[in-house]
Amino acid sequence: MTGDPIDRVRNREVWAAVNADVTDPGAAGLWEQSEVSWGLFRIPEATLGLLGDVRGLTVAELGCGTAYLSAWLARAGARPVAVDLSHHQLASAARCQDQYDLHFPLIEADAAVVPLRRAAFDLVISVYGAAPWCEPSAWVAEAARLLRPGGRLIFLTNSVLAALCVPEDEGYATDQLQRPQRSLSPVTWPGGGTEHHPGHGEWIRTLVGAGLVVDALHELHPPAGAATHADYEIVTAEWAEQWPAEDLWVAHKPA
């Protein structure tokens, strides 16, 4: 997570509370999904076509939460390892593994210091896990270390614009900037954790500095008829129709 030990403890506490209120009650529903969907507005993988054929691929999911994405990858024939700092979320993941009789390794670890072998993975993936919650240069360097030559990194996080427009205390993103961009990495929310939302240029420098090649940046908008997410007060569907709510990055490690 973030490089500050105090922030790491605070973030772990935040996710203990979020897990109790949101991710644990919702875990089973996500484990039962028949297809990967991306982001707050559940954009189907079939629409974006990012993953391709994952059969036989070794996958490290960093900041896995309840590991529903790893579960889908396992059903599709991949060999995932799911990593998270929150033992509460991993306990929810373990319960779902037993419930659905689908098991793969669950590891409690910081995404910036993963106890896994160098160059062991074809794909490193993170959906609202490492990207907003860890210091960017630390976790991206670790992702690059884990990847085999030719392996891919895919990660999803809040858009920079959404992070700029979310009110200080509570409420959905507005149509006005609420803070300077230089204050976004790190940014500590009142009553919440510490996140990182660097600008696109900084993300590119971080990825290239770790030895990766940037392949794509998808700025996500909701599909037609999408509803505002019931649990996460970040952006409304109406806001996201006008401005990108999420950034989905794709990079690879040169062969």
Give the residues covered by each predicted segment.
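N-terminal, positively charged/glycine-rich alpha-helical extensions of SAM-dependent methyltransferases
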Residues: 1-32
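Conserved alpha-helix/loop element of class I SAM-dependent methyltransferases that forms part
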Residues: 29-57
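A short glycine-rich, Lys/Arg-flanked "PGG" loop and its adjoining helix->strand segment in the class I
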Residues: 137-152
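Conserved class I S-adenosyl-L-methionine
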Residues: 152-185
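A short SAM/SAH-binding and catalytic strip from SAM-dependent methyltransferases
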Residues: 123-137
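Short alpha-helix
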Residues: 193-217
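A short acidic, Gly/Pro-enriched loop at the edge of an enzyme's catalytic core
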Residues: 112-123
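Class I SAM-dependent methyltransferase SAM/SAH-binding core
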Residues: 58-113
